[in-house]
Curated annotation (Swiss-Prot):
GO molecular function: DNA binding; DNA-directed RNA polymerase activity
Gene Ontology biological-process entries: DNA-templated transcription
Biological role: Promotes RNA polymerase assembly. Latches the N- and C-terminal regions of the beta' subunit thereby facilitating its interaction with the beta and alpha subunits.
Protein name: DNA-directed RNA polymerase subunit omega
Biological source species: Syntrophotalea carbinolica (strain DSM 2380 / NBRC 103641 / GraBd1) (Pelobacter carbinolicus)
Uppermost EC category: transferase
Chain's gene name: rpoZ
Length: 68
């Protein structure tokens, strides 16, 4: 399988900083036993698997409203 790049993920989440936050949270979910959203055919590490999920458009995120 081809290498995953930040540019692949930025097509789904256009802000680099938000991408890092979403990827970190999703990776923690996988480490705590969360179910993978795509098949891990290459037996990648959880961080790489998380980035593949984001690039595939399988990870949803929501920006919380600011408190006034």
């Amino acid at each position: 399988m081809a290498r995953i790049t930040v540019e692949d993920c930025l097509q789904q989440i256009p802000n680099r900083f938000l991408l890092v936050m979403v990827a970190a949270k999703r990776t923690k979910q996988l480490y705590k036993g969360g179910q993978p959203l795509i098949e891990n055919k290459s037996n990648n590490k959880r961080v790489v698997h998380c980035l593949r999920e984001i690039a595939a458009g399988k990870v949803d995120y929501e920006i919380p409203a600011r408190k006034a």
